[in-house]
């Protein structure tokens, strides 16, 4: 190999929802990372979690996603609530849905304290997302989860 040219291995994770490439650009991004998810199925919802530190930036390279977003009570009064109990979050929250696709190119910025999740609308959807804090550094303390259906949301595709 030519001197100073290097090859870096990429972490791979797979489950029944998606295949993920984690920390794609490890070098030069010591505090942040870029991940890529290949979503196999349109039948699964991924999510309902928020981060206390991370901001995520989502971009659909191929396919389409229905993205659910909920502003948590903690986001409204962040300074008073350092230790969050997800059971105390008001379930009457308003779920907003955004749609990302390769036909409507945009980046969705998801700040801390916003619950988020998604369902692929097309099999084989590819989501590339940048996070401003490395997952391994903050994941133990940064990730708060509630189950799908917690907010009474409908992940279906409505007939119009």
Where on the chain are the PLM-derived regions?
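Asparagine-centered strand-capping/turn motif at beta-strand->loop junctions
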Residues: 119-120
